[in-house]
């Protein structure tokens, strides 16, 4: 078997943890998972250790970066040590999802351009992302220097091909994220909406809260809104909640084993984002066959269809979101079966694991 070296930033473990096991059927993999000491622990550490125990040809290297400031001399030295370890293996290719400082400028002294693949999670950096200016700077540098890339949406594929001409690019969507079977079910007579995932400004949870308050004042029918995800500034959103009885809040990192029951309680999911390149949360929604109300953005429109398996609104449009939520509440019994059936058809046709993994293998084998 040939060897791959795989380098994953902590924030992208939830993507790679689903693809690595399938690639192990073809390659030996040296997997470096990198996180910073400001985290108490790596969220997926238990799951990663279980994978390493299950597969003999997977060698897991969990790396905690200790430097407190990324622009310090210590951070540069620490990153050089990491890059030296990564390149110590004889490998067919290096695949990396890290595109920031000091990793990118230092990597040119260690990586070979011809056999390094970067995962471009955001060719277009979404509005509201923290450190967006520096992210654009170092990502742009990487995309001009290196040759090989993966994108996770068709719109990002086209953007990369037109912006950075002459690059080798392949598109493979996220593998649907299955965390197990739910043991819960929706509450009888209560239409329940779910927003799931890390709460960030560009995801516009304030829009969801305000729209929910509007719906509360417009109907006497029972409904509930579940908001589940880690947030560092929840006080900025809490202030919009006037009727806490319609909200179920889980403002924390949601352990993987609790995710199925979150979706088991919901009927619909809501993603009113201002901007997005692609969404891991949507992959979980599709996996659990929960129709979405979501923003009219290219990354969403290439996957779902309005009035067929989803309902679209203008990005972060509070009035339209309230209208769609109210429509779902008032017409749930008549619209829901067709929405779910169409969503399950989309899941079968577009997200076969075998087809997705073949895209990775075909690209890697051409290098």
Regions found by a protein language model. Give the residues of each.
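Nucleotide-activated donor-binding/catalytic signature segment of Leloir-type glycosyltransferases, i.e.
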Residues: 236-260
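Donor nucleotide-sugar binding/catalytic pocket of nucleotide-sugar-dependent glycosyltransferases
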Residues: 144-181
